[in-house]
Amino acid sequence: MADLLAGAGIFDVDVDDAVADEHVRSSAYRRVVLVTASSRSRGRDRAIVAAILRDPIEMVSKSAVVALVDRIAMKVTGPAEFRQWSAELLPEIDQLKAERHREFIHRRVHDWLFYLSIEDGHMPTPVELAKVTDWMQRVLAEESTSLAVLALLDESGSRKKIRNIAKNRAGSRKLRAQ
């Protein structure tokens, strides 16, 4: 813990408190993730993920790793860069004992690859859309600027709420375009 915090330049966390209290550790991990994601270099990411994943409470470590995945996905230049970055982390992620935690992180990576491919110009099919989580479908419904993607979500979204968000956003985008 001390090395992880020092490596991120965080010196105001009591290491003994962090070791003893999962809430203090979780907060410290969030800060480490922020520093790590804001760095231009990705060279230390695997070692940082490995250190976080040694936490005795997998839910705490999983949450921190997911936060890093989310931040890096929003920072990369495209799906190829994210695919390469995430592939370097998968051996560490696969060390998690709980299969549900491993699967959750793998699904999140898949979701972001899907999102980034759309941002890169790919128009997904209904079958591809069905393979991403409800969370990612909602992110797309709330953030996509593509009328074609919004129409797909309106027609094929997995939940009524997703379909309604997409339908309403597509309608308002059409009005603004007129």
What residue ranges belong to the model's regions?
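Alpha-helical scaffold segments
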Residues: 1-178
